[in-house]
Curated annotation (Swiss-Prot):
Phylogenetic placement of the source organism: Bacteria, Pseudomonadati, Dictyoglomota, Dictyoglomia, Dictyoglomales
Membrane-spanning residues: 4-24
Entry membrane topology: Single-pass membrane protein
Keyword hit for Cell membrane: yes
Pfam families: FloA
Localization, UniProt: Cell membrane; Membrane raft
Record-stated family: Belongs to the flotillin-like FloA family.
Name of the molecule in the record: Flotillin-like protein FloA
Amino acid sequence: MSLLWGFLILILVLIFLGIFFSFVPLGLWISALAAGVSIKITDLIGMRLRRVPPGVIINSLIKAHKAGLSEVTLDKLEAHYLAGGNVDKVVNALIAAQRAGIPLTFEKAAAIDLAGRDVLEAVQMSVNPKVIETPVVAAVAKDGIELKAKARVTVRANIERLVGGAGEATIIARVGEGIVTTIGSAESYKEVLENPDSISKTVLAKGLDAGTAFEIVSIDIADVDVGNNVGARLKMDQAEADMRIAQAQAESRRALAIAREQEMKALTQEMRARLIEAEKEVPLAVAEALRSGKIGVLDYYTLKNIMADTAMREAISKLGQKEEEGRKD
């Protein structure tokens, strides 16, 4: 009977040890003690219950302790992990900042990390500035010649403005705007080609890094190419547009003239019809005048002679006009 009880106690002890070691990473606890980091068994059990991987927290804490970062504590690391942060990257950033002499607190690094920024890359950029290449920017000088410029912007991360500061896209856009303004204010494209550093000096003096997460160290013009003669092309387009407008106006006047001509022809036909209609009334009027005695027979024949004389003169005039036209031909 005592043997059975002893066997049951052994099984219970083994079960307890299995559960205990599943909650407590003994090797990790020993590593922490060997590194001089005081960790309680209850802290490890609490991390297991809160579903926080002890390896990530303890290894980061050991790393911070060895680097002399006394402000980094177990509670801060665990809280940052539970907030969704990258504990290992924050500790590495703090170590890099300490070695480079950059003032950076754990709270600031954690805030940068939670804001979605790569805090370790930011610290590295503070030490080793990054070069950003802008796309080709096209602008037109006052003489109408297009220039295409490409710049290299050297920037250093500004730790204080990483949270809430604008990113690389803003720097590229502002530099492009400055290039366009500088080229556009040049009297001739030759001025820019002869002195391309005037672009970088003008753009750098504008303080384009205001409100961004970076500090502009330098702006260098990598390449300047001559593009199209935009001024000449615009003048050609304007001349072509003016010509089309003039053609349209001339066509409109021609159409009005044709319409007026047709209108006058119709009016002439109408007047001719009225004349013919009036001429038909002349013999009737003459006959009525003869019957009523208003004119005599001699008057009638005198009128006939005048009409015949007029017709003869018109015929002679038309014949003379035809002969004159024949001589000219």
